[in-house]
């Protein structure tokens, strides 16, 4: 009964209003408030500040600065294995595996369309049909910057408006096509393994999503927006393997997609496996 009421509330709550309010709180610079709130959060979620560049939680100008904190050099070593595909973020594997019949597995009894996930453009979705995916969930205690699984050159970025349901095991199991319904930012890179999609999915009280090249991406009008970066008028944007590409100001989930016969995920990884940014998720397959 409790679970059912929680799911019903997800449909009834004013998602974007709550997220705007959360954003105001997260940007508050009133010292006594932001210090008390940040201390409470760090204690409540057992945040490990020993690996942060700035360990004192009260030294951050606002909660968002704390939440998107940088780590000390060497805190996240990159897997040196040749051909390793890195985890883009700290968190836990939500799901990973093959993309079958154009759909990505979400949870028992649920999947969602690659086409819808990427914003509805068939040309964008086609290279990933029959490929592989990995979904990483970032919990509140985790490091919330997202990094490159492989070196890549940005080709296209798509902001896809949508709902902002909470993201957790309960909603994954009960909200159909959760990740293809929530607000998200789709980034398409050209890599040594062909096209790679890195999708940053928002969630309830996720105030904003940023990228290192565009800054704040989530626009106030909440309209589908596509920006192409492979045009002659734009300087190429190339990011090295392990480089930061974006961050969440609260929440949520990063999804990586590859085309067919490009990667093989590590056999020891499964739903629920903890991962850290820079850890190997799998290996690139030998080229034919």
From Swiss-Prot:
GO terms for biological process: phosphatidylethanolamine biosynthetic process. It is found in: Cell membrane. One of its GO terms (cellular component) is plasma membrane. Keywords: Cell membrane, Decarboxylase, Lipid biosynthesis, Lipid metabolism, Lyase, Membrane, Phospholipid biosynthesis, Phospholipid metabolism, Pyruvate, Zymogen. Its main location: membrane. The active site is at 90 (charge relay system), 147 (charge relay system), 252 (charge relay system), 252 (schiff-base intermediate with substrate). The keyword Metal-binding does not apply. One of its GO terms (molecular function) is phosphatidylserine decarboxylase activity. The modification Pyruvic acid (Ser) is found at residue 252. NCBIfam families: PS_decarb. Belongs to the phosphatidylserine decarboxylase family. PSD-B subfamily. Prokaryotic type I sub-subfamily. This is Phosphatidylserine decarboxylase proenzyme. It comes from Pseudomonas fluorescens (strain ATCC BAA-477 / NRRL B-23932 / Pf-5).
């Amino acid at each position: 009964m409790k679970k059912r009421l929680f799911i019903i509330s997800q449909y009834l709550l004013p998602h974007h209003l709550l997220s705007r309010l959360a954003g105001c709180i997260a940007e508050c610079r009133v010292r006594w408030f932001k210090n008390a709130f940040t201390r409470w959060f760090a204690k409540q979620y057992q945040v490990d500040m020993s690996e942060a560049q700035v360990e004192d939680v009260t030294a951050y100008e606002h909660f968002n600065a704390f939440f998107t904190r940088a780590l000390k050099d060497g805190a996240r070593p990159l897997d040196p294995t040749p051909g390793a595909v890195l985890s883009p973020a700290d968190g836990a594997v939500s799901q990973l595996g093959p993309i079958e019949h154009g759909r990505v597995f979400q949870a028992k009894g649920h999947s969602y369309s690659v086409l819808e996930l990427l914003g509805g453009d068939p040309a964008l979705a086609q290279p990933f049909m029959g490929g592989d995916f990995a979904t990483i969930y970032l919990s509140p205690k985790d490091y919330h910057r997202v990094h490159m699984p492989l070196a890549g050159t940005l080709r296209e970025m798509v902001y896809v408006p949508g709902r902002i349901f909470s993201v957790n095991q309960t909603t994954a199991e009960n909200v159909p096509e959760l990740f293809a319904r929530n607000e998200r930012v789709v980034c398409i890179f050209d890599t040594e393994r062909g096209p790679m999609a890195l999708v940053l999915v928002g969630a309830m009280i996720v105030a904003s999503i940023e990228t290192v090249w565009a800054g704040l991406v989530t626009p106030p009008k909440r309209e589908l927006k596509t920006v192409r970066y492979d045009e002659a008028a734009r300087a190429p944007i190339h990011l090295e393997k392990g480089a930061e590409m974006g961050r969440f100001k609260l929440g949520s989930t990063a999804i990586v997609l590859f085309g067919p016969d490009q990667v093989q995920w590590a056999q020891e990884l499964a739903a629920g496996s903890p991962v850290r940014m820079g850890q190997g998720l799998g290996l690139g397959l030998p080229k034919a």
